[in-house]
Amino acid sequence: KVANSTARNPRKYAIVTSIILLVMVAFIPTLKATGISTLEGFTKKPKSLIGQELLLQHFPGGQSQPTQILVSKDKSEAVIAAVKGISGVSSIAPEIQDPANPVVKEVNGKIVLDATLKVPADSSAARELIPEIRKAAKSVDNEALVGGISATFHDVDVAARHDRNLIIP
């Protein structure tokens, strides 16, 4: 039935389809290419979510998944000072593998700094801190690299926005 109607009036269907597509294209700028945090992904409140919310009330949000910064050992103190000045950073210190034996692991003159954020590591607020952390670290050590879950999510968001703006239009 639809096929016969389309065959009899192809121009009418082409015009209507074009109008519908144009209306849909008009809303592309409202497309949000940002993710949601793990806590926002639940439709109900399981006990693990309640426990996580309680932890967030008493401890820095990024404590369980710190942002990691790879820096030259000789520039680490200056990087620590630069990153400490960022309002969303709760603390920063060299990564220690074993609390019983607190030795900073050094590989090829580089060490890892753990920056604990005040907000949950998977939140959009944490993702927004990454460019500032990178800028602060690179202002001291041009070869500094910033990683961790927040940096990964930030980079995925940047790539998704780039692809959306390149491919969709």
Predicted regions and their residues:
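Residue-level detector of functional hotspots within protein domains
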Residues: 4, 17, 28, 53-55, ...
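Structured non-transmembrane domains adjacent to transmembrane bundles in polytopic membrane proteins
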Residues: 33-169
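Transmembrane helices with small-residue packing motifs
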Residues: 10-47
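Structured helix-beta-strand junction loops
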Residues: 8-9, 140
